[in-house]
């Protein structure tokens, strides 16, 4: 089905019907004077739970219909975001935005809106009106690369479960031709494809190095500092700057891994009482930093979750929901330029370098005044110093008592 052109571009929107069961695969081809400027092919559906007039919850699944409009879709450029907007009649609309950076583009602000006033789609709905659900995920894709993901990506954003699969996507297409360079999603990769194997080469043989009982220690380089920011709509709600080094000590040979920001994607979300920063790359399925508000006055790092693949291809995962790091007043940021060690468990530590983080109350996309980690040390040293001083006084009192007692006893003997 070919739809009418958008101003400044042309959109071809095709629905494919596969097999006996309708599976509407969207193919979107936005064009400009040079040719294709945005290409997307994917499948999706949405499972929505809503309350009915008989005081029960009803769950429906909405797939892409065979009729849709595309008002508002655009190619974008260096200054303006690209976007795809799809309308499923009166009841449902869906949109995704793309922002171009120097070396990559971001996929963000995936928004689903559904109207429960449509009794055909939502029979017996109590809360009638338009409901909007925003997916907080933020993906980075290099320019001149097509992103592919055949696996089902599931996002549970209560009361909606969103599923996407069969994705072929490239925004800001260069020279009017879709790239042959591919970036495959992590879900399509197996541990054996992402686990690094170190080889040495000789003229006729290749030898895989294996750890020995007495490996020669080599210094681990300091990790590169990355900048991460999460947006809530058009407003930045979380900022983090840090170099990250992961240490796993349960292996026979400790596993140390530096996170490279250039090859790491990040997503997250912001809520009034909690905030999340999630990192992932080819070796890390996810690394979550979850922040919480304490006593309505301070924030702290409450939880860390990690799932990653080790050099031998095995998976490692750990979760700790009872942490208490990076404590600072709301409205400020937390900073620590020196190396810090976060003990998540006995087997897993995170070393941070040049850390600065603000998960709440970000103003104008900038960090607020920072509380330095040296203040934590001062707060820790003060009670130690006071305790030491009191201990010294107590020792002097006891010494004086025993000396006096001894003299008194000697006096009795002389008498």
Swiss-Prot record:
Residues 202-213 have a biased composition (Low complexity). Monomer. Forms large homooligomers. Interacts (via its cytoplasmic region) with HSPA8; HSPA8 mediates recruitment of proteins with a KFERQ motif to the surface of the lysosome for chaperone-mediated autophagy. Interacts with HSP90 in the lysosome lumen; this enhances LAMP2 stability. Interacts with MLLT11. Interacts with ABCB9. Interacts with FURIN. Interacts with CT55; this interaction may be important for LAMP2 protein stability. Interacts with TMEM175; inhibiting the proton channel activity of TMEM175. Lysosomal membrane glycoprotein which plays an important role in lysosome biogenesis, lysosomal pH regulation and autophagy. Acts as an important regulator of lysosomal lumen pH regulation by acting as a direct inhibitor of the proton channel TMEM175, facilitating lysosomal acidification for optimal hydrolase activity. Plays an important role in chaperone-mediated autophagy, a process that mediates lysosomal degradation of proteins in response to various stresses and as part of the normal turnover of proteins with a long biological half-live. It is a single-pass type I membrane protein. Disulfide bonds join 37-75, 149-185, 237-270, 336-373. Residues 405-415 are cytoplasmic. Residues 26-188 are annotated as: First lumenal domain. GO terms for cellular component: autolysosome; autophagosome membrane; chaperone-mediated autophagy translocation complex; extracellular exosome; late endosome; late endosome membrane; lysosomal matrix; lysosomal membrane. GO terms for molecular function: enzyme binding; ion channel inhibitor activity; protein domain specific binding. It holds the Pfam family Lamp2-like_luminal. Residues 234-379 are annotated as: Second lumenal domain. It comes from Mus musculus (Mouse). InterPro entries: Lamp2-like_luminal, Lamp2-like_TM, LAMP_CS, Lysosome-assoc_membr_glycop. Detected in liver and kidney (at protein level). Detected in liver and kidney. Glycans are attached at residues 29, 45, 54, 57, 97, 115, 175, 227, 234, 247, 265, 280, 312, 317, 322, 361. The keyword Methyltransferase does not apply. Gene3D superfamilies: 2.40.160.110. This is Lysosome-associated membrane glycoprotein 2.
């Amino acid at each position: 089905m070919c739809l009418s052109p958008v101003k400044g571009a042309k959109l071809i929107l095709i629905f494919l019907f596969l097999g006996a069961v309708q599976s509407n695969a969207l193919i979107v081809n936005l064009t400009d004077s040079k040719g294709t400027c945005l290409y997307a092919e994917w499948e999706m559906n949405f499972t929505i739970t809503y309350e009915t007039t008989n005081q029960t919850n009803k769950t429906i699944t909405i797939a892409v219909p065979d009729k849709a409009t595309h008002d508002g879709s655009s190619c974008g450029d260096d200054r303006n975001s690209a976007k795809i907007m799809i309308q499923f009649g009166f009841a449902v609309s869906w949109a995704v935005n793309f922002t171009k950076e120097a070396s990559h583009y971001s996929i963000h602000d995936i928004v689903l809106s559904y109207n429960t006033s449509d009794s055909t789609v939502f029979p017996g709905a109590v809360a009638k009106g338009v409901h909007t659900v925003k997916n907080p995920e933020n993906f980075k894709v290099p320019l001149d690369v097509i992103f592919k993901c055949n696996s089902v990506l599931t996002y549970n954003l209560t009361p909606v479960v969103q599923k996407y699969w069969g994705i072929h996507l490239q925004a800001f297409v260069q020279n009017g031709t879709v790239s042959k360079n591919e970036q495959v999603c992590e879900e399509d990769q197996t541990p054996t494809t992402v686990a690094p194997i170190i080889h040495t080469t000789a003229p006729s043989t290749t030898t895989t190095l294996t750890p020995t009982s007495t490996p020669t220690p080599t210094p681990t380089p300091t990790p590169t500092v990355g900048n991460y920011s999460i947006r809530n709509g058009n407003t930045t709600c979380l900022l983090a700057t840090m170099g990250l080094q992961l240490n796993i000590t349960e292996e026979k040979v400790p596993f140390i891994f530096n996170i490279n920001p250039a090859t790491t994607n990040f997503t997250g979300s912001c809520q009034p009482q909690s905030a999340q920063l999630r990192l992932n790359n080819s070796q890390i399925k996810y690394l979550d930093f979850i922040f919480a508000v304490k006593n309505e006055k301070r924030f702290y790092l409450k939880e860390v979750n990690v799932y990653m693949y080790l050099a031998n291809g095995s998976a490692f995962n750990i979760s700790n929901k009872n942490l208490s790091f990076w404590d600072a007043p709301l409205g400020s940021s937390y900073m620590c330029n020196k190396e810090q060690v976060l003990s998540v468990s006995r087997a897993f530590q995170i070393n941070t370098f040049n850390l600065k983080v603000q998960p709440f109350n970000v103003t104008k996309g900038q960090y607020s005044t920072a509380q330095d980690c040296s203040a934590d040390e001062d707060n820790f040293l003060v009670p130690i110093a006071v305790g030491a001083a009191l201990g010294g006084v107590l020792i002097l009192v006891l010494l004086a008592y025993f000396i006096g007692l001894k003299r008194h006893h000697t006096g009795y003997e002389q008498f």
